[in-house]
Every structure is written in structure tokens, then in C-alpha cells.
Regions:
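Alpha-helical transmembrane segments in inner-membrane proteins
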Residues: 2-660
Length: 660
């Protein structure tokens, strides 16, 4: 059976090699006659422009694609091995976004030179790594704490990047294409800098081979075998962070390869660590090589697109196709080394107090604000004048925060994975892509089509996830991988459209950032009605949400029909996410963090967890919307970005508090 399972991906890999070789041959032949290849490779004639392009552009581009692809496959295995999570990749600990933030700052400051950008990328990645290690150190760098700290710090850096883009859109236009990954080369300098750095990374990885193997076991077993677990994790993750920063500096952010290559290596039968490291590096090099040759062909027949976009568009369908054949997927137990507050009693009193606090926040957001003369408390006629402007956006923020938080609770309980959230399922990105696509297809003012276009995008995404995950027995982790594949593909497509320079993208940039600016009374009423219906259904799923985190075997033992239950919960979470996304755009924080905040406050039983998460999500977004209107008055910051700035410090405080 295992041989038959491994045969299909092996044939697929061979097919990809043949296609990549054929495309390379065709692209090189179009650029230069085959009779001149040898001369152009070794000693190009400076009077023949085709030979110069062949030597200084095409060949270095081929070499850099192989080097970067191999490096991404290598660091993907490192992250997945150390964190024991199949969803871990170079962006998991915030490495890529930290490096990108460093380079964004150097771009704004107009600091010249390749060494300046390389130093900025390394500095950004290392600062993020130090913050993550500092948060998780008190818990002996447990995988769950590292993942959560890395995710929220990554969100924080991403929010800063997005904020800089909103206020410096024209100045950072060139960053859009680079952010999605570009392998364009003008000499051999990039290759000459990168290959010795990668070789050093490979040598250090081989030195860490035994500790890395033991880190794939349970923490207790690894310690009993004599491994200094915290030190080993620190060394392995530091190595992965440095390699990732070097790759980001070289070509920008190329997603998906770090996730896909290790999974395909495992499917090919590479169970032991060393063969998996080697095979994942080869697969990563092959995928990036193929993607870049497709781009060279597209540039000639259509237009230039970014490498990261094509990589995601190739990798996502491949992963969806291969998912049913992936047998063993596991994630770390969310309770490993995870001390949380004692279970809270008197839940009703806490819920009432939270409701009162939320009501007070709404009143303050409605009445307290700034105008041309300074701070003022609006009342009477002034409040009546302000209500049509403030009421819709405050209610939109409240409803969206509640729905995203409840959706996050459902998804995390359904999958048992601490990285699970509405945006990981790809539904938010699918809805956003539907809206942006409609903007490009419909002439004139297309915002009237926002709701149907976004709903269709979310529905198509959900359908693809259900088909891909259902073919393999509807495993929760297959579902997460399918969602992550689609989310990566949609995000890369959105970034590619941003890089196109089309002025219409500026119209939706704030909406994508989670802005309540365009909320209307009619939209808020529709959202409120849908929210009430969906929240009324949620308590009916209480038994399922209580039993599913105990595992599939336990659920079957008590008579639960797993597949229909998982489909029903997925549909509920998808409807909550899509409705919230249509209202204020694809947020990237509340659905992930609100359930964790409620849990760390001591609410772990199903209904208390859901209720407190909903209150936390609503309060967070209402406060974020108010801050977004007031902090830089009269300018505004989207609530989605502000919720990240507000929520991340509190979440990190809770993580640190647990480790004392």
C-alpha cells in the first residue's frame, strides 16, 4: 500500500522535472541560438546583446531559483521538525514579515546598497526571533508557545508593513512586486553571495542532525534521552531564522514552498530526517525552477508576473490534489507545557460584566471623540448629527468582532490545532479575492457588487476545501492544509494585483486592511440579522465542540458521526467568517487571538469559552475602530490593523504571565 501511495507523487515529480527541463530549453532557445550557448555561458561576446543577457540574466536567474528553492525546502523541514506542526513554514515565527519590515524601512529611508538591505532583513528577522524566544523562554520554548508567539508577532509586523503602505503607497509601489518574490538578476552577484551562505547553513544543519531527530519526539522522551531541549530548539530555530532572512533578502517573500516541499518529501516515503531534508531541498528547487521558467514564458507571451504568485498557483492545486494521499498528519497537543489560569467559576457574572463593559465601550465610541476644536463629548443635537456616521461603523466592528471570534473558537476546537483560525481556512482571502476580481471586471463604481462577489468567493473557497478534505476522510488537518493552500494562493494573487499599479487597487487597500469606513445602515442590519441566526445555531453544536477536541477515537466511541459533524461545523464557521468579511474586510487577528485570550483567562469549557471569546472579539474591534478614528485625526487607520496593535501586546502579556 505504501509503495502505491509513494508511486503517484514520484511520477508527479518526474513529470515536473520533464516540464521544467522542456520549458528551460524553450526559453533559452528563444533567447539565443543553441550553437552559441557554450560561448555565452563561459565567455560572452560583449558586442552581442543576446549573449550578454544569456550570461548575466538567464543563467544567474536559473541558479538563484535552484538555490532559493532548495533553501526554502530546507528551512521548511527545520520549522516543521522543531515545532512538530505540519503547518509550520518560514513565515510561522514571523521571520519573513520581520525581514520584509526591515527592508521596507530601508526603502522609505532611501538607504542604498545591497549590504544595507541584507543587514536590514537580518536585523528585522533577528529582532522578531528574539521577541518570540523571549516570550517562550519561560516555558522552555514549547512548540505551542513558540507557534502562538510567532504568529502574533508576525501579524504585528505585517500590520506595521500594511500601515506604512497605506500612508506611503506611491513611495512603496516598487515593494509590491518584490514582496511577492522576484528572481530577476542582472549579474552573478546575488548567486555569489547566496551559495556560500546556504552551504554554511547546510553544514550547521548536519551538525544538528541528532538533536533535530530527537526534537521530533515528545518533550519528555527527548529529555530522557539526554537532550538539552531549550538549547537545541534555540539553536535550530536561530539557524532557520537566519537562512530565511537571507532568502527573503535575496528574492523577497516566496510562499508555499516551505510548506509544500517537506509534505511532498514525506509522501514520497522520506520518513527519516536526513532523507527528508535532502528530498525537500530537491523538491523546493524543482518547484521554484519550474515556476520561474513559466514566468519567463509568460513574460514573452503576456506580461511579467511575480515568482511567488506563480509558485503559489502551481503549489496550491498540487497540494489539493495530493491531500487525500497524505496519511499521517499530526499537530502538537495544545496542552503540552501549557499552564493556563484555573477554570473560572460564576461564568454568568463574568459574562454580564463583559456585556456591561462592551456596552460602555459602544457608548464611549459613539459620544467621545475629536473635532476641529479638540476633544469633546457629544450629546443632544450634536450626537444626533453624528449618529449616521458613527453608528454603522461601530456596529459593523462589533458584529464582525463577535462573529470572527466565535468562528475562531469553532475552528480551533474542530481541528485541535493552535494555528487554526478563519483566515487560515482561506475563506477570508477567498472573499477578498472575489471582491477585488469584481472590481477589475465591472466598470465604474463596483462597490455595489461587493456583497455578492465576496459571498461567491467565500462559497467557492469553502466548496474546494470540502472536496479536497472530504476525499481523504475529512481529516481536520487535511482541511487546514487545503485552506492554507487556497489562502496562500489568493493572498499572492491579491499582492500581484497590487503590484500591477492599477489605480483601482488603491480603492480597496483600506478595505483589505479591515476598515469600517464603508459600512452602511442597511449593511449593518443585514449583518446583525445573519449574526443572530448563526449565534442561535452555535449552542446546538455544544456537545460536538466539547467532544471533538478529545480526538476522533473518543468521538466515535460515544457514537458521533465524525464526517457530517465536521462538515456542519465547517459550514457554520465559514458562514460566520464570510459575513464578517463582507462587512469590514478580511481581518487577520481577532479570529486567531480572541479564543486564545479567553482560554488563557480561564474559560475552557465550551459555552463559557465561546461567550467570552465573542465579548473579547467585539470589545477589541470596537476599541480598535475608535482608536483608528482618533489617533491620527483627521486621518484614519483601519480597525483591522489597530486591533492587531492593541491585541498583540495583551496577548504576549498573557503568554508571559503563564510562564511565571
Amino acid at each position: 500500500m505504501s509503495k502505491r501511495i509513494a508511486l503517484f507523487p514520484a511520477l508527479l515529480l518526474a513529470l515536473l522535472v520533464i516540464v521544467a527541463t522542456a520549458l528551460t530549453w524553450m526559453n533559452f532557445s528563444q533567447a539565443l541560438p543553441r550553437s552559441q550557448w557554450a560561448q555565452a555561458a563561459w565567455s560572452p561576446d560583449i558586442d552581442v546583446i543576446e549573449q550578454m543577457i544569456f550570461h548575466y540574466s538567464l543563467l544567474p536567474r536559473l541558479a538563484i531559483s535552484l538555490l532559493v528553492g532548495a533553501g526554502l525546502g530546507l528551512v521548511g523541514v527545520l520549522f516543521q521538525q522543531v515545532l512538530r506542526n505540519p503547518l509550520a513554514e518560514p513565515t510561522t515565527l514571523g521571520v519573513a514579515t520581520g525581514a520584509q519590515l526591515g527592508i521596507t524601512v530601508t526603502t522609505l529611508w532611501a538607504i542604498p546598497g545591497a549590504m544595507a538591505s541584507q543587514f536590514a532583513a537580518l536585523a528585522g528577522a533577528c529582532v522578531v526571533g528574539l521577541i518570540v524566544f523571549g516570550v517562550a523562554w519561560g516555558k522552555r520554548l514549547s512548540p505551542v508557545t513558540l507557534i502562538l508567539a510567532g504568529l502574533v508577532v508576525s501579524l504585528y509586523c505585517g500590520a506595521i508593513n500594511q500601515l506604512l503602505v497605506i500612508f506611503h503607497h506611491d513611495q512603496l509601489q516598487s515593494m509590491f512586486l518584490w514582496s511577492t518574490g522576484t528572481l530577476t538578476q542582472t549579474d552573478w552577484g546575488g548567486v555569489e553571495r547566496l551559495w556560500p551562505q546556504l552551504l554554511g547553513g547546510v553544514m550547521l544543519t548536519l551538525l544538528l542532525l541528532r538533536p533535530l531527530t530527537l526534537m521530533g519526539l515528545d518533550d519528555g522522551v527527548a529529555r530522557n534521552l539526554g537532550l538539552a531541549l531549550s538549547l537545541a530548539r534555540l539553536a535550530a530555530l536561530s539557524l532557520a531564522i537566519v537562512i530565511s532572512a537571507l532568502l527573503v533578502n535575496a528574492v523577497g517573500i516566496i510562499g508555499f514552498i516551505g510548506l509544500f516541499a517537506p509534505l511532498l518529501a514525506k509522501m514520497l516515503g522520506a520518513r527519516r530526517l536526513l532523507p527528508r531534508l535532502m528530498l525537500a531541498s530537491l523538491i523546493g528547487a524543482l518547484i521554484l525552477w519550474l515556476s520561474d521558467q513559466i514566468i519567463l514564458w509568460l513574460t514573452r507571451v503576456w506580461m511579467e508576473v511575480s515568482t511567488g504568485s506563480v509558485t503559489a498557483l502551481i503549489g496550491a492545486p498540487l497540494l489539493l490534489w495530493l491531500l487525500p494521499r497524505l496519511r499521517s498528519i499530526s499537530a502538537p497537543d495544545m496542552k503540552v507545557n501549557d499552564r493556563v489560569a484555573a477554570e473560572r467559576q460564576h461564568v454568568l457574572a463574568f459574562a454580564l460584566a463583559g456585556g456591561v463593559l462592551l456596552l460602555m465601550a459602544v457608548v464611549v465610541a459613539l459620544s467621545f471623540g475629536r473635532d476641529a476644536h479638540g476633544w469633546t463629548w457629544a450629546s443632544g443635537a450634536l450626537l444626533e448629527d453624528l449618529m449616521p456616521w458613527r453608528w454603522p461603523r461601530i456596529m459593523a466592528a462589533l458584529f464582525a468582532g463577535v462573529m470572527l471570534a466565535v468562528a475562531g473558537c469553532i475552528i480551533q476546537r474542530l481541528t485541535g490545532n493552535p494555528m487554526a483560525s478563519p483566515e487560515v481556512l482561506g475563506i477570508s482571502s477567498g472573499a477578498a479575492f472575489g471582491v477585488v476580481l469584481m472590481l477589475f471586471l465591472v466598470p465604474g463604481n463596483a462597490f455595489g457588487w461587493l456583497l455578492p462577489a465576496g459571498s461567491l468567493g467565500a462559497a467557492v473557497t469553502l466548496l474546494i476545501i470540502m472536496i479536497a478534505a472530504g476525499r481523504g476522510g475529512f481529516s481536520p488537518h487535511r482541511m487546514l492544509l487545503a485552506g492554507m493552500a487556497l489562502s496562500t494562493a489568493f493572498t499572492m494573487l491579491l499582492m500581484m494585483l497590487q503590484a500591477s499599479g492599477d489605480p483601482r487597487m488603491a480603492q480597496v487597500l483600506t478595505w483589505i486592511s479591515g476598515s469600517t469606513y464603508n459600512a452602511t445602515d442597511a449593511q449593518v442590519w443585514r449583518t446583525g440579522i445573519v449574526m443572530v441566526i448563526l449565534l442561535a445555531i452555535t449552542p446546538l453544536c455544544r456537545r460536538w465542540l466539547t467532544i471533538l477536541p478529545l480526538g476522533g477515537d473518543t468521538a466515535r466511541a460515544v457514537g458521533m458521526a465524525l464526517t457530517p459533524t465536521r462538515i456542519a461545523l465547517l459550514l457554520l464557521a465559514a458562514c460566520l467568517t464570510a459575513t464578517a468579511t463582507m462587512t469590514i474586510g478580511p481581518l487577520s487577528f481577532v479570529g486567531l487571538m480572541a479564543p486564545h485570550i479567553a482560554r488563557m483567562m480561564g474559560f475552557r469549557r465550551t459555552m463559557p469559552h465561546i461567550v467570552i471569546s465573542a465579548l473579547v472579539g467585539g470589545l477589541l474591534l470596537v476599541f480598535a475602530d475608535w482608536c483608528g478614528r482618533m489617533v491620527l485625526f483627521p486621518f484614519q487607520i483601519p480597525a483591522g490593523l489597530l486591533s492587531t496593535f492593541i491585541g498583540v501586546p495583551y496577548f504576549i502579556y498573557l503568554l508571559r504571565k503563564q510562564s511565571r
